[in-house]
Swiss-Prot record:
Protein name in UniProt: SsrA-binding protein
Source species: Photobacterium profundum (strain SS9)
Region (Disordered): 136-158
A cellular component annotation (GO) from this entry: cytosol
Record GO biological process: trans-translation
Subcellular location: Cytoplasm
Role of this protein: Required for rescue of stalled ribosomes mediated by trans-translation. Binds to transfer-messenger RNA (tmRNA), required for stable association of tmRNA with ribosomes. tmRNA and SmpB together mimic tRNA shape, replacing the anticodon stem-loop with SmpB. tmRNA is encoded by the ssrA gene; the 2 termini fold to resemble tRNA(Ala) and it encodes a 'tag peptide', a short internal open reading frame. During trans-translation Ala-aminoacylated tmRNA acts like a tRNA, entering the A-site of stalled ribosomes, displacing the stalled mRNA.
Entry similarity comment: Belongs to the SmpB family.
Segments of skewed composition (Basic and acidic residues): 136-151
């Protein structure tokens, strides 16, 4: 029996609550300005983006609330701040679109996932609008119905 090819997943961390709490409109790929010890810690998977948020100041985008736990061996010569504010690397047009979405349309910017692209750490961010309780219930019902439908179709073809 042949083995399945090992599909390497480049995802480092996902913000699962973002898709539950927000309706995502658009998504963008942003680079992160990181220090050396942060890259080493990210390679070991010591990152959490669940409580993170993106804000715009002076025409630049920043992310706050990302927790990168420093490694004991890698960060001995620097004072490591695990929750420091990090700059996002975006094009001017992308920053202008984000600024328009936040100011005019009342949307917010949330971090969706962090992943490797070649040797670079990238962050997938999205403009989003908060969901109401009835929207969350409707999404839950539609997911349950889709799951039941698949189960029914699977058993009906036998």
């Amino acid at each position: 029996m042949a083995k399945k090819p090992n599909k390497s997943d480049n995802t480092i961390a996902k913000n699962r609550t973002a898709r539950h709490e927000f309706a995502i409109q658009d998504d963008y790929e942003a680079g992160l300005q990181l220090q050396g010890w942060e890259v080493k810690a990210i390679r070991n998977g010591k990152v959490n983006i669940a409580e993170s948020y993106v804000f715009l100041r002076d025409g630049e985008a920043f992310i706050s609330g990302v927790t990168i736990t420093p490694l004991n061996a890698a960060s001995t010569h620097v004072v490591a701040d695990p929750t420091r504010t990090r700059k996002l690397l975006l094009n001017r047009k992308e920053i202008d679109k984000l600024l328009g979405a936040v100011n005019r349309e009342g949307q917010t910017i949330v971090a969706l996932s962090m992943y490797w692209k070649a040797s670079w750490v990238k962050l997938k961010i999205g403009t989003a609008r908060g969901k109401k309780l009835h929207d969350k219930r409707a999404d839950s019902k539609s997911r349950d119905w889709a799951r039941d439908k698949q189960r029914i179709m699977k058993h009906s073809t036998r």
